[in-house]
């Protein structure tokens, strides 16, 4: 058996191996399974008062069985021998009446990941509830001290320790432990119907890598206050500049367009674009699952295949779609190690993908634009991933003479994704949001509808 561990949980490994044995005994031709466990602490505070203080732990199991070309997927939370036996019998019973699936499969043994790196996804230091409450208090007090803030929307601090084990009947056993620390603050500025609310937050694998609580609170306060007096702006066609927090949503549209599931369903506008220029030639998109201390890192994908560093867009040119075993077989290509687990179902995911930054500062980007719309919030989904039609509500600031001017709201952006991607550029402020990173993005060719 290929064993691939990164500080795994031996008890969970024992449970997943027992489950696969039970599935085989129940009649399955093959099977794969995940067993997971988590321990969480969360605290909440508002206006100096503790509102929540919770600790919870959970465990669960997902099983997929193969029987004569038919598959069934089941989930459960009983990890006892009897509980696992019932789950295995239920899965095999369901598979007998399931339709055949010509594409679902396990990896060949020689495709499986091995010799895995240590990714530093686990922080051994568990924070005390007292330390988390102190952190929350410091952040809220800083936010309330910002001139113009009239109330607190609340502050929350959290910590999660997770263990995940994936195993297959054809020889893979992989486990990983991870941690996540978080702190978020929401501020309220103004009174009555003129109130404005915004937030700031920080997430990290290691508690010591969180942003300073005072910095988070001050930023939440400043972001709330600066929206006061916002009104709909005029209809115009000027450059649109997305701050990183919303730029990552634009980047996610691009990443969604190369998802293998969309490709095989016929819902990707980039289905036939490998080898073609899709984004501005000055830009590339990279993926590195092996970044140390990063929230998106992983040593193997959801089917036990190896992951690797990739250039997904090379100087504007699309180099690959993202595939798991099933979508790769359906598309007639090799899997790329991008399987993800959502319960017993297999999807597509990526690990630490980022849009290349430039050397231009945000200030210089604003100055070069002269007049522009600087977007700080987007509303709704607004993208047709088959046609590329894009329309989305937005708020932010008008840029005049290269500087942020009055706040604006109730604006609507419209354009064509294909044109927007080719006409975008980035600043030098690369910012990470979980497993995705992007800098400030500038796009041209959009219509901005306002008052």
Task: Please identify what each model-predicted range represents.
Residues 1-298, 302-305, 314-317, 401-403, ...:
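Active-site bordering "gate/hinge" segments
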Residues 271-451:
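Dual-mode signal for accessory low-complexity, basic/Gly-rich regions
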């Amino acid at each position: 058996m290929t064993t691939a561990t990164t500080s795994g949980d031996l008890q969970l490994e024992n449970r997943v191996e027992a489950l696969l044995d039970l599935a085989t005994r129940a009649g399955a031709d093959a099977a794969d399974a995940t067993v997971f466990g988590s321990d969480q602490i969360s605290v909440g505070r508002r206006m100096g008062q503790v509102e929540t203080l919770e600790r919870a732990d959970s465990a669960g199991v997902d099983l997929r069985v193969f029987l004569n070309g038919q598959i069934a997927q089941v989930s459960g939370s009983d990890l006892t021998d009897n509980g696992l036996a019932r789950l295995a019998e239920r899965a095999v019973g369901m598979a007998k009446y399931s339709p055949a699936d010509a594409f679902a499969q396990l990896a060949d043994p020689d495709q499986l990941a091995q010799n895995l790196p240590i990714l530093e996804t686990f922080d051994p230091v568990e924070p005390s509830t007292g330390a988390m409450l102190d952190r929350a208090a410091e952040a809220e007090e800083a936010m309330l001290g910002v001139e113009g803030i009239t109330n607190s929307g609340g502050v929350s601090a959290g910590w999660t320790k997770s263990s995940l084990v994936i195993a297959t009947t054809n020889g893979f056993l992989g486990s990983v432990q991870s941690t996540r620390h978080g702190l978020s603050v929401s501020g309220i500025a103004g009174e009555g119907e003129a109130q404005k609310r915004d937030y700031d937050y920080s997430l990290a694998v290691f508690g010591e890598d969180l942003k300073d609580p005072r910095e988070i609170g001050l930023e939440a306060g400043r972001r709330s206050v600066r929206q006061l007096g916002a009104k709909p702006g005029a209809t115009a066609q000027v450059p649109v500049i997305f701050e990183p927090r919303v730029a990552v949503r634009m980047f996610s549209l691009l990443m969604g367009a190369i998802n293998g599931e969309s490709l095989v369903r016929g819902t990707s506008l980039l289905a036939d674009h490998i080898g073609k220029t899709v984004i501005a030639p000055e830009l590339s998109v990279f993926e590195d699952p092996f970044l140390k201390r990063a929230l998106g890192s992983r040593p193997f994908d959801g089917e036990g295949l190896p992951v690797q560093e990739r250039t997904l867009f090379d100087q504007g040119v699309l180099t690959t779609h993202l595939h798991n075993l099933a979508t790769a077989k359906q598309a007639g290509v090799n899997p790329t190690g991008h399987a993800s687990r959502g319960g017993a179902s297999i999807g597509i995911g990526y690990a630490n993908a980022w849009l290349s930054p430039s050397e231009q500062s945000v200030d210089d980007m604003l100055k070069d634009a002269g007049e522009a719309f600087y977007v700080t919030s987007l509303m709704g989904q607004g993208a047709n991933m088959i046609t590329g039609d894009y329309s989305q509500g937005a708020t932010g600031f008008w840029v005049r003479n290269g500087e942020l001017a009055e706040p604006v709201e109730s604006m609507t952006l419209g354009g064509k994704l294909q044109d927007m991607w080719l006409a975008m550029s980035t600043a030098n402020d690369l910012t990470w949001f979980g497993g995705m990173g992007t800098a400030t993005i500038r796009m041209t060719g959009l219509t901005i509808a306002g008052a």
